[in-house]
């Protein structure tokens, strides 16, 4: 395992999120026997390895909280959501939120610590890395810290408890503690708020993370923004106490990295605080802004986003869905969804993909549930993602250099504004991606960055659409650009290769 801990991540990893509890439940049904992390059939690990991922995020492996589960079952809104999702819902389907953690040990239902170690070995044998959760902002009401280390938490008073019982709770040791929250929404009823300014809590968080780092290759840090000094002060004001001279994340990440230098930190980030979290030590931060642009805006907004500094973009993780967002198939019509996938998969940064996304799943599953309803598979979507992942992997695009391209139009045709275009270069390999991010047919001239195009002719192979285009004259490509005409939500994903003139002459003869 020591050797595994030293394995580094690629510069722009592709990560696949799996709901561990639900996945093992479905495998148990499929194989008609109890499946835990230590006896997942090898063909299931093989199936993951074949798809071109660099890491697997097993979401929700930590010990669930009995108290949190009871709160879930007694909260009408949660129960109603579960009933809408599962027509045959029963209370046994509720597992409690994986983000209300009872303890950072793999849940016995999933196979415990030994099962998690077996899963990591199985993944490592297939050159896959393991990503797990870390929830820095709060713990479950029955987490041992609540009674053993009340000083780790934001404190309240009896007056607070009487005035606002939804935001405070009485611990069994008599302490009044705040429930977890962010500055914009009511408190989460199944959580207790940790105090990011507590020196004891920071030490305990670093120790917890080092134990986690001994068991996996990285963590996705839930609501990481809430631990920033400025955000925590705005949320809790005088209850937070004196503002420390150092930031929580700089302190905690630095301590972990001293022992585990290659350990990966991903931040769930919002509110345009991605750059700030990157400066505190995070390898990647959620690119929620790009997601919102793809959902609600057009090509111009997306293009503007992609003009950001490359050092910033390369430390974003891009996605169309995850367990917090609606399913992409329910958000994007099929054609738009494929166009959006082309954008996130062929731009810089890490990629986050979600179990069920490739099959066109439409039901957003509550994190409180341990099973999901069956859904029909969208065979066209599955084939699209299979081909896209294969091509990105085969062409090793994410190891190269990326450049945004201009796309020009004509006085009487400004549809070029709908086109997004960029290039990748890796040694002699060149790739061009063009996406029509609109519901109208669009045309334009893509200006290519390569200075040596004028020497000879060039073949274009659009592998995602299984088309090979006639060779283009290099002088024209160099001066005027590449003419592109795409249907609504259409795309090209093309390799550019210089034609061997002598070989072409021999074939013609």
Q: Which residue ranges define each predicted feature?
A:
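Active-site and adjacent substrate-binding regions of carbohydrate-active enzymes
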Residues: 2-509
């Amino acid at each position: 395992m020591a050797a595994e801990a030293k394995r580094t991540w690629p510069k722009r990893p592709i990560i696949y999120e799996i709901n561990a509890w639900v996945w093992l439940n479905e495998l148990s049904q499929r194989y008609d026997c109890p499946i835990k992390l230590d006896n997942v059939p090898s063909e299931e690990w093989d199936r993951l390895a074949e798809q071109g991922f660099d890491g697997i995020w097993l979401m929700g492996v930590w010990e669930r909280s009995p108290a949190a589960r009871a709160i879930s079952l007694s909260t009408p809104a949660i129960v109603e959501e579960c009933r809408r999702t599962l027509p045959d819902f029963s209370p046994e389907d509720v597992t409690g939120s994986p983000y209300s953690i009872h303890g950072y040990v793999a849940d016995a239902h999933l196979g415990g610590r030994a099962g998690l170690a077996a899963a990591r070995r199985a993944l490592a044998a297939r050159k896959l890395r393991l990503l797990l959760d870390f929830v820095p902002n709060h713990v479950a009401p029955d987490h041992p810290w609540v009674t053993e280390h009340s000083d780790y938490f934001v404190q309240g008073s009896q007056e607070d408890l009487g005035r606002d019982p939804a935001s405070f709770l009485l611990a069994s040791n008599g302490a009044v503690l705040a429930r977890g929250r962010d500055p914009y929404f009511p408190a989460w009823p199944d959580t207790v708020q940790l105090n990011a300014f507590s020196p004891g809590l920071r030490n305990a968080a670093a120790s917890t993370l080092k134990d986690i780092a001994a068991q996996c290759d990285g963590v996705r840090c839930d609501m990481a923004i809430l631990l920033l000094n400025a955000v925590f002060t705005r949320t809790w004001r005088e209850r937070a106490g004196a503002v420390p001279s150092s930031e929580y994340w700089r302190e905690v990440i630095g301590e972990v990295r001293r022992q585990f230098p290659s350990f990966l930190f991903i931040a769930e980030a919002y509110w345009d605080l991605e750059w700030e979290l990157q400066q505190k030590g995070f390898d990647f931060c959620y690119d929620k802004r790009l997601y919102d642009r793809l959902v609600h805006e057009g090509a111009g907004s997306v293009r503007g986003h992609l003009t950001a500094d490359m050092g910033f973009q390369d430390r974003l993780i891009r996605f169309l869905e995850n367990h917090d967002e609606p399913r992409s198939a329910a958000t994007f019509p099929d054609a738009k969804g494929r166009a959006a996938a082309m954008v996130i998969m062929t731009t810089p940064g890490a990629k986050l993909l979600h179990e069920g996304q490739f099959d066109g799943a439409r039901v957003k599953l509550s994190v409180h549930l341990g099973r999901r309803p069956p859904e029909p598979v969208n065979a066209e979507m599955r084939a699209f993602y299979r081909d896209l992942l294969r091509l990105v992997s085969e062409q090793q695009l994410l190891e190269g250099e990326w450049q945004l391209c201009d796309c020009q139009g004509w006085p009487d045709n400004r549809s070029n504004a709908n086109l997004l275009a960029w290039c990748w270069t890796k040694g002699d390999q060149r790739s061009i991606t063009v996406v029509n991010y609109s519901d109208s047919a669009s045309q334009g001239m893509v200006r290519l960055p390569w200075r040596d195009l004028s020497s000879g002719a060039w073949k274009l192979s659009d592998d995602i659409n299984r088309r090979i285009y006639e060779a283009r004259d290099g002088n024209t490509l160099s001066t005027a650009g590449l003419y592109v005409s795409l249907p609504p939500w259409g795309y090209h994903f093309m390799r550019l290769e210089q034609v061997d003139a002598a070989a072409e002459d021999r074939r013609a003869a």
